[in-house]
Amino acid sequence: MAESEINNNDGEPVFAVLTQYLKDLSFENPSAPRSLRPREKAPQIDININVNANPIGDDNYDVVLSLSVKASDDSETLFHVELIYGGVFHIKNIPQEHVMPLVFIECPRLLFPFARQIISDATQNGGFPPLWIDPIDFAALFQKRVAEEQKNSQTLSS
C-alpha cells in the first residue's frame, strides 16, 4: 500500500498489512530415522494456537500467531513444530469497538495461510508427509478470550 494511502487524513477507514515476518521456527525430529518408518495408523496430532497483539506506535498493531504442533504414535514423539509468525497491521479511523475484533480475528485470519504453509513445508522437509492444518475459527477463539477475560475480571472484583 502506498504511503499516501496509509497516511490519508480524510477519515476513511484504513486496514493495511505493513509487513509479515517469521519470528521463530523450530522443528524437532527426536527419533529420526526410526520415526520415519511407515506406520499402520495415523499419528495423534496435537495443535495449540495462541494469538497475541500489541500496539506499536500510532494506529499500528503487531499481531503474532504462535503454533505448536506435536505428532506422536503411542509413547513416541514423531515430530514437534513450533512457529511464531507475525504481522504488523495499520488500523486507522475504525470505531474503537471494532478494533479488537479486527486485531484478533481478521489479522490472524490473514496470517494463518502463511503460517500453515511454513508448517507444511517444515514437516515435509523433516521427512514426513506435509501437515495441512485445518482452517481455524479465529472468531470463536476471540469470543472464548473475551469470555475468559470477563470471567477473570468478575472473579477479581468479587
Curated annotation (Swiss-Prot):
Any GO MF annotation of the entry: unfolded protein binding
Keywords (A to Z) from UniProt: Chaperone, Cytoplasm, Protein transport, Translocation, Transport
GO biological process, one term: protein tetramerization
InterPro entries linked: SecB, SecB-like_sf
Broad class of the protein's primary localization: cytoplasm
Pfam families in the record: SecB
Domain of life: Bacteria
GO cellular component terms given for this protein: cytoplasm
Localization, UniProt: Cytoplasm
NCBIfam families in the cross-refs: PRK05751.1-3, secB
Role of this protein: One of the proteins required for the normal export of preproteins out of the cell cytoplasm. It is a molecular chaperone that binds to a subset of precursor proteins, maintaining them in a translocation-competent state. It also specifically binds to its receptor SecA.
HAMAP family: SecB (MF_00821)
Family, per entry: Belongs to the SecB family.
Subunit description: Homotetramer, a dimer of dimers. One homotetramer interacts with 1 SecA dimer.
Protein name: Protein-export protein SecB
Gene: secB
